[in-house]
């Protein structure tokens, strides 16, 4: 009877160890996934900060002014020629 008890006891310890080993494995896996997600969030925040720098409204004002100037530029010589005509 005694060897059976020892074998059952060792089997119980082995099952307990196996369960905790799986739990530890799962915990390590979750920690690694969490760290990866945190790193991705930080990189995403950095990219968002860069987007704010690119979307500077002052730069857009200059671009808009150049676009308007390109549309009006061909008409400037006509305005210059017609300006003295109206002063007579």
From Swiss-Prot:
- Major localization listed first in the record, in broad terms: secreted
Would you say which domain of life the source belongs to?
Eukaryota
Q: Which GO terms describe its cellular component?
A: extracellular region
Q: Which residues carry this modification: Valine amide?
A: 85
Q: List the disulfide bonds.
A: none
Where expressed (tissues)?
Expressed in entodermal epithelium along the body column.
Identify the stretch annotated as signal peptide in this record: 1-18
Location(s) in or outside the cell: Secreted; Target cell membrane
Which keywords label this protein? Amidation, Antibiotic, Antimicrobial, Immunity, Innate immunity, Membrane, Secreted, Signal, Target cell membrane, Target membrane
Propeptide residue interval(s): 19-59
Stated role? Antimicrobial peptide with a broad-spectrum antimicrobial activity. Keeps its antibacterial activity under a wide range of salt concentrations that mimic physiological conditions of human blood, which is surprising, since Hydra is an obligate freshwater animal with nearly no salt tolerance. Does not affect red blood cells.
Tell me its family.
Belongs to the arminin family.
Q: What is this protein called?
A: Arminin 17593
């Amino acid at each position: 009877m005694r060897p059976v008890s020892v074998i059952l006891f060792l089997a119980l310890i082995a099952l307990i160890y196996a369960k905790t080993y799986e739990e530890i494995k799962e915990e390590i896996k979750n920690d690694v996934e969490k760290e990866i997600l945190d790193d991705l969030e930080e990189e995403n925040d950095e990219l968002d900060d860069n987007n704010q720098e690119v979307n500077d409204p002052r730069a857009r004002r200059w671009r808009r002014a150049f676009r308007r100037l390109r549309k009006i530029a061909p008409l400037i010589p006509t305005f210059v020629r017609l300006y003295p005509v109206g002063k007579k």
